[in-house]
UniProtKB/Swiss-Prot annotation:
Primary localization: cytoplasm
Family annotation (Pfam families): EF_TS (PF00889)
Sequence similarity: Belongs to the EF-Ts family.
Localization of this protein: Cytoplasm
Keywords linked to the UniProt accession: Cytoplasm, Elongation factor, Protein biosynthesis
PROSITE patterns: EF_TS_2
Function: Associates with the EF-Tu.GDP complex and induces the exchange of GDP to GTP. It remains bound to the aminoacyl-tRNA.EF-Tu.GTP complex up to the GTP hydrolysis stage on the ribosome.
Record-linked SUPFAM superfamilies: Elongation factor Ts (EF-Ts), dimerisation domain (SSF54713), UBA-like (SSF46934)
Protein name: Elongation factor Ts
Taxonomic source organism: Methylibium petroleiphilum (strain ATCC BAA-1232 / LMG 22953 / PM1)
Amino acid sequence: MPAITASMVAELRAKTDAPMMECKKALTEAEGDLNKAEELLRVKLGSKASKAASRVTAEGIVVAHISGTTGALMELNCETDFVSKNDDFLAFGKTLAELVATKAPVDVAALSALEIAGVTVEATRTALIGKIGENIAIRRFKRFSGDSKLVSYLHGTRIGVVVEYTGDDVAAKDVAMHVAAMKPVALTSADVPADLIEKERNVAAGKAAEDAKAAEAAGKAPQSAEIVTKRVEGSVQKFLKEVSLFNQTFVKNDKQTVEQMLKAASTTIKGFTMYIVGEGIEKKTDDFAAEVAAQVAAAKGQ
């Protein structure tokens, strides 16, 4: 078998983008045959991707791409915070956001079929999984286009906001920053989803019921049904004010609401979208004690 030289390893790495040690192992296994080593690596990287596919991806990045009145916001997930800072992972996310903005895929499947430098997004993702050793998932994206101006704000790589607006650019940027900080769920109270309102109403009613039980236990008269109804409705209205953008106190000036700030700046917000990394994904937690106990039990044949 010919000696495995540094130049052979470098050439294989350039072709496959695999780690140096993986390239050396493949060349050794292929007895110096570069083509065979490349084939072995392709299989190995694909195998790594298959094994990683079932693992939870609750970390990652949010990326925005804005070009005039066209833009995109997307979330790319991985398994650990460490990988979310990897240069290749970050570059992949940036490229995907640009693809969404320029090619307008309708869903993740359509995005995965697009090409990056002659290679499909899916093949690129699979190769990156093999290189990094973690599952990588394109979770979601939204494309923006139309007559409205666009502005984005990124809080690191974990929170991303895109605001659609007409009017003052500085005011719109401030709103994007405000959204990231205060996390409204809708523009106005009327836009808040009915299920969130119902949930808040149930919570308020539950608190009132607990107070009634406590009053009875203390030998006091509980609040009347009329007072309870007003109390519940008051809680709901307070909630609506807290979660609707226009009603929120402006984060940079607590003397005015966002709506008042926008009016003074002659600016209209048409909509906003916010992504938070891992939002709604149940993260896996490792129970070390339980794992050790299971291993001991297995060793005892239990």
